[in-house]
Amino acid sequence: MAAKDISTEVLQNPELYGLRRSHRAAAHQQNYFNDSDDEDDEDNIKQSRRKRMTTIEDDEDEFEDEEGEEDSGEDEDEEDFEEDDDYYGSPIKQNRSKPKSRTKSKSKSKPKSQSEKQSTVKIPTRFSNRQNKTVNYNIDYSDDDLLESEDDYGSEEALSEENVHEASANPQPEDFHGIDIVINHRLKTSLEEGKVLEKTVPDLNNCKENYEFLIKWTDESHLHNTWETYESIGQVRGLKRLDNYCKQFIIEDQQVRLDPYVTAEDIEIMDMERERRLDEFEEFHVPERIIDSQRASLEDGTSQLQYLVKWRRLNYDEATWENATDIVKLAPEQVKHFQNRENSKILPQYSSNYTSQRPRFEKLSVQPPFIKGGELRDFQLTGINWMAFLWSKGDNGILADEMGLGKTVQTVAFISWLIFARRQNGPHIIVVPLSTMPAWLDTFEKWAPDLNCICYMGNQKSRDTIREYEFYTNPRAKGKKTMKFNVLLTTYEYILKDRAELGSIKWQFMAVDEAHRLKNAESSLYESLNSFKVANRMLITGTPLQNNIKELAALVNFLMPGRFTIDQEIDFENQDEEQEEYIHDLHRRIQPFILRRLKKDVEKSLPSKTERILRVELSDVQTEYYKNILTKNYSALTAGAKGGHFSLLNIMNELKKASNHPYLFDNAEERVLQKFGDGKMTRENVLRGLIMSSGKMVLLDQLLTRLKKDGHRVLIFSQMVRMLDILGDYLSIKGINFQRLDGTVPSAQRRISIDHFNSPDSNDFVFLLSTRAGGLGINLMTADTVVIFDSDWNPQADLQAMARAHRIGQKNHVMVYRLVSKDTVEEEVLERARKKMILEYAIISLGVTDGNKYTKKNEPNAGELSAILKFGAGNMFTATDNQKKLEDLNLDDVLNHAEDHVTTPDLGESHLGGEEFLKQFEVTDYKADIDWDDIIPEEELKKLQDEEQKRKDEEYVKEQLEMMNRRDNALKKIKNSVNGDGTAANSDSDDDSTSRSSRRRARANDMDSIGESEVRALYKAILKFGNLKEILDELIADGTLPVKSFEKYGETYDEMMEAAKDCVHEEEKNRKEILEKLEKHATAYRAKLKSGEIKAENQPKDNPLTRLSLKKREKKAVLFNFKGVKSLNAESLLSRVEDLKYLKNLINSNYKDDPLKFSLGNNTPKPVQNWSSNWTKEEDEKLLIGVFKYGYGSWTQIRDDPFLGITDKIFLNEVHNPVAKKSASSSDTTPTPSKKGKGITGSSKKVPGAIHLGRRVDYLLSFLRGGLNTKSPSADIGSKKLPTGPSKKRQRKPANHSKSMTPEITSSEPANGPPSKRMKALPKGPAALINNTRLSPNSPTPPLKSKVSRDNGTRQSSNPSSGSAHEKEYDSMDEEDCRHTMSAIRTSLKRLRRGGKSLDRKEWAKILKTELTTIGNHIESQKGSSRKASPEKYRKHLWSYSANFWPADVKSTKLMAMYDKITESQKK
C-alpha cells in the first residue's frame, strides 16, 4: 500500500493502527514500562499488575556484555524451582567501566542503569485481558530452572539501529553524561496548580513546556539526581527516554484518569502503584555497604578520600565512588562496619591450622557471648552442640529439623562458634536457593554482625566486581592471595557459572540449604559441589528425602564418600523380617549423622495448625470439559497400565486443569461469557464468569470474604502459574490488595514483595505463591491462613507451603484450607498423598529420614495413573445439578462438612505407638479393577467403540492405498527410465504428497529406519568423537543420536565411511588424470619456451604452465551425498576418525588411570603467536586431554572443566568489532592505532576462539602423528606476525589421511556448505604456485608477509615496522595479476624460498645474486604489461610480490636497490 493511500489519521497514530517503520524492530508487548527503552517510542505499552518487571529483548547481540552462553552452555539437568528470571533485566550501558579510581570530586564511576526497576502505575482495565496472552498451562516447573539468571538484576538494554549507528560513527567517551532514568515529574513552580492541565490530556510539547523532571544521570549515582526542565537538559544522550516517560507517566496517566468508565478504586490503585515506585527509588539512595576506599587526586592537585559504595537493592556493578565526607553523614553505621572489617582480627589468614587432630568437643551449656542478636532456644543450642561434636571428630552431617525450627539460625551460630571458639576464620561457603538469600543475609546481620559475609550473586560484572574488591586483601599480588571475607553466601546457579573461580578456593566449611537438591548424584550441581576443596560439610533440609534409598545414598556419599554402602530398596507393600532388619541396621549406621526434630517435640509454645479439606462440585462447564477429556482419550485410557506413561500423565494434567478452572483451556472464557453475560465484556460479566465457571472459585470467593471480614491474612498456593494469573485477575477486579511470587518474579522484586506483605502497616490481604517457588525458606508468618488451591503430587511440597505461615514466631492459630473438586482425580491424588505422609512419618519414627520410599518416583507409574483416572469418572456421565448447587452454595455448610486432615501426625521422634498410629489412619483403597467400559454409559460407549472401529478401518484402507501408490510409483519410474521420459516421474506427485506425513511418522516409529535427521546426527557425532562403534549406546542414551537400533546405526556408520573412502578415491583418480593431461601440455609448452618459439615476455597469462600450477595448488573439499543428506565432507570424516583414534589409543595406553597426566614429552610443538592468553605446551596438552574427554569441538566444556585449568585462556564469546569487519575487506595494511577501523585492534577480539582451537588441535594431532613440519603450524593463522621459513615438500597423503579445508565443528559456517565459498577464504599466495603437492589444511600455504587471515578476514603484515610506502603499494596491487606475471620464473622464486642453510656462505650469496638478477630482469621486461597500473607502479608491485619469497624479512625497496646495484656493476 502506498503512503498516499493511508489516511492522515492513520499516519498520525501508527501505534493505534499497528503500523511500524520497516527499519525498526517490531514493538513487543510489555507488561510494565521501562523508560530506558528510549529507542522505541512507538511501543504500545501494556500494564499488568502481575508482572513487576519488563521483558527486554536485546536485538543487538554485538553489544551484549554478559558472560556468554549462558548460561546456554551450562548444564541444566538439576535446575532450581524459583530461579528462571532470564527475561527480566535492566539496560546495559556502553563503555561502562568497573569501579576504579577517579580524579573528579564527584562520583564518576559508571553505574549500571536501573531502568528496569521502574515499575509503573497500573492502568486499570474494566475487563480481563488474559485472552490476549499466550496461555501457559504448565505446572510451575519454570521455577525448576536451577540456573536462574541473576543477570536479571541488571541485564541488557536493546539498542536501536540509530543508536548503534551513532555509537559507531561517533564513539562516546568513557563516561558520557546523559539521561539514565526519568524518575518523577512535577509542574513548574511558575505555573498555577494546573487547573487547565488537569482537565485535559496534554500532548508531548505541553509536557515539555509545563513540567520539571527528576533525572538520574548515567555517570552518577541516585544520590546526585536533579530536577531539570526540558530546556535545561539540553541535547544529551538518552533524551528520548524523557519523551517515553511523558507518554507513559503523564499523557497515558491523564487519559486513564479522564476516562469516565474508570472508577475511584482504579485511580486509587494507580496512585498506590506510583507511590510504591517512588518508594523503591528512594531505596537506591541508601548505602548498603562500603566496599573499598581510595585517596583520589583532584584536578586542583589536592587529594580526597573516596568510598566505593554499594547501594541498597542495586547490584555491585552499579557501585560508585563517592566523597567519603558525604557518605559519613549519610550512613555512619556503614562506615563503622567498613572500618571494622578493614581492621578485623578474624580474617582467614589468622586461622588456626589443625593438621593432626582437632580440639576435643566442649559442650555449650549456655549461649556464648559471640552469638548475638537474640536468645537461642534450648533445642537450637542442642543443634549447635551436635554440629560442633561432628566437627571435632572430623565428621559431616545432615541438619534435618522440621521446617520452621530455625535451621538457618543454628547454622549461622555454628559458623560463629567455628570462628570465635576454634579460630576457623574461613572462608566458609553457604549455598542456598535464590528465594532464601534475603533471609540468610538478615540472619547473619542479626546473629553474627561481626562476620564479613558477602552475597555472591548478580550479573557477570557484579560478580567480577565482587571478586576484585571483596575476595582478597591483596588482589593484585603476584604470589599467594589472602582471603578477605569470612562467609560467602551464594546460590546454586553461581556454583555452576563460576565453578572455576569458586572451586579454586580452599573452603573450611560448606553448608547447603534445601539439600534435597543434591539427591541426584549425576547432576552438575552435585558434581560441582563435590569437586570443591572443603574441610567439612553440612546439609540442611526440612525434607531430608522425598523418594527412595538411592537419594539417601547420594546425600550420604556427598557427606562421607565411600563410608556407607546403601543400595537396597525398601518395599513397604511387602514387608518381611529381613527388610525390617535392614531398616534397623540402616537406622543404627546413619543415626549419628542426622539430626531430626519436629515442632511438636521441641516447641510447645507454637500455635496449633488445623487443615481442612473443602470439597466442592464442578461447574457445568468444568464437567463438560472433564467428560470430553475422558471420551476423546478413550483409546489411551483403555490401554491402562499397558499404555504409555506419558499419555496417561498428559490426560491427568488435563483433568487437573478441568478440576481447577475452565479458563485454563483456550477459548473457554468466550464460551463462559456467552453463558453468563450474553457475550458482553463488562466488568460484572467478567467477574461473574471468573467465579461461576469454577466450583473452587465460588468457594474461594465466599471464603475470602469471610476471612477478610474476620481480619485474617491469606496465602494462596497453586502449582500452575496460569492459575495464579486467573486469581490475580479476580483479586484485581475485586479491588483486593495482593502480592505475588513465582518463578517469573526476579529476585529484587521478591524481596520487596515479601517485605511489603510482612510490614506492620501493610494493607495486603492475599499473597499468591506457586507451590514450589513459594515453598522454600520464605517467612510469611504475618499470615495465619493458607489456601492450597490444588494439591501437589508430592505432599512434602504442600507441607513446605504450609510452613511459610506455621513457624516459630507465629502467634495465631494457623488454618489450612485445601480445595478439592468432588469426584475427580484430585480426591484420589489427595488420598495417596495422605498414605505417603503416614508412611514417611512411620519411617522417621524409626530414625530413617526417608519419605516416599515405596515408589521410585514422586509421580505415579502408569498403573497408578490408570487407577487414579478411573476415580469418580462414572459420575461425569450422570446428569447433575451441580451448577445450581454452586449458585446456592453455603459456606457454613461446606465448613461444617469439611474433613480434618492431619499432615503432621502426633508422633515426633518417639519409637512408641507406631502400629497404633498407623491403625488410626487405615484407609480403604478404591478398587480400580473395574473397566472403562463399566464407567462410560452404554450409549456413549457404543458410540466411542464405533468411532474407534471406523478409525481403525480408515487407517487400514489408507495403508493399503499407500502400498498400492508406492508400487505404482515404482513401476512408473522403471517405465519412464526405460522409455527415457523424465517428465512423467512426477506426474503423480500430488497424489503421493498426501501420504508423506504418514510415512514420516511411520519412519519415526521404526527403530530400523534411518532418515536424514539420523544421518546428520551421526555425521556430527563422527566429527566430534571419531569412531562411534563402542559408544553408540551412550550417544543414544544422552540424546546425541535419535533413538534407533544399535545395529542399524552400526551399519549406517560403516556405509558412510565406505562412501567417504570411495568418494576420496574417485576424486584422487580424477585429479591424477587431469594432472597427467596438464603435465603433457606443460612439457610441450616448456619446450617451446626453451626453443624460443614462444617469447617469455609475450606468453599469455592463461598458458599451460599456469593452468598446471593452479590445478596443483587447488584445494577443494571432497563432498558427497549420503541417504538424502548433501555435501558431507569425506576427507574430514576419514581424517577425524584416524586422528581421534590415535589420540585415544595414545592416552589409554599410557595414561589410562589418570588422563590428566598426559604429556607431549620431549616433543615441543611450534608455539602460538599473539594469542591473548599465555598459551604454552602445557595448555596444548590440556587441550588434547579435553578433546579426548569431551570430543572435538566441545570447546565450551573444555573451557569450563576446572581440572584442565584453561578456563581463563579460551575466549569463545568475544564480540567482533563491526567497524573492523567492515574495513577489513578494503584494507591490507597493518592495523595502527591512528587508523580507526583498519584491521583488527587489540580490543576487537580475543584469541583463541573456537576456530583457533580447532586449527590448533588439527595441528597438534598431525604433529603427534608426525604429519606436520613443526616449522609451519597452521595454528598460527590469525596471529599478527606469521613465521616465515623454508617449507618442505610433502608428498600427497593417502586418501584416508587427508583433511578438508574447513573444520566443521570449529567454524561458524556449516560443514556441508558449498565448497566454492570455502575456497574463497583460501590465501592466494605464491606458495601454492610453487608447491607440486596438494596441500592439507594442516599444512597451509607458506604464508606471505601480508596475507589474508581466515580467522578475521583482515590482512596482517608480518613486519609491523615496514614503511608506509610499502604498505600503500601492497594495498593497491593486484596479487592475482602479479602471480600470473611471475609464474614464468617460478623456479627462481622456488629456489629463493628453499633457502641456503646447507650451503656455503659464498655459494649461497652467488645463488642469491643470480636469482635476484633473473627476477629483476623479468620484472623489467614485464613492468609495462599491466593495464591497471603505470610501469613504475607495476614494477613496485612485482618487487613487493617477489619479496615474499625472500628467505628473510626484507622490504621490497631494498631488493630493488640491490638489483639496481648489481645492474650498475654489470654495466661497468
From Swiss-Prot:
Annotated Helicase C-terminal domain residues: 699-860
Domain of life: Eukaryota
Placement of covalent cross-link Glycyl lysine isopeptide (Lys-Gly) (interchain with G-Cter in ubiquitin): 1144
GO-annotated biological processes: chromatin remodeling; DNA double-strand break processing; double-strand break repair via homologous recombination; negative regulation of DNA-templated DNA replication; nucleosome organization; regulation of chromatin organization; regulation of transcription by RNA polymerase II; regulation of transcriptional start site selection at RNA polymerase II promoter
Molecular-function GO term, any one: transcription cis-regulatory region binding
Comp. bias (Polar residues): 126-139, 1297-1310, 1354-1364
Keyword flag Nucleotide-binding: yes
Domain Helicase ATP-binding: 388-562
Other facts noted in the record for this chain: Present with 1620 molecules/cell in log phase SD medium.
Domain comment, as recorded: The 2 chromodomains are involved in the binding to the histone H3 methyllysine at position 4 (H3K4me3).
Family statement drawn from the similarity comment of this UniProt entry: Belongs to the SNF2/RAD54 helicase family.
Assembly information from the UniProt record: Component of the 1.8 MDa SAGA complex, which consists of at least of TRA1, CHD1, SPT7, TAF5, ADA3, SGF73, SPT20/ADA5, SPT8, TAF12, TAF6, HFI1/ADA1, UBP8, GCN5, ADA2, SPT3, SGF29, TAF10, TAF9, SGF11 and SUS1. TAF5, TAF6, TAF9, TAF19, TAF12 and ADA1 seem to be present in 2 copies. SAGA is built of 5 distinct domains with specialized functions. Domain I (containing TRA1) probably represents the activator interaction surface.
Protein name listed in UniProt: Chromo domain-containing protein 1
Gene responsible for this protein: CHD1
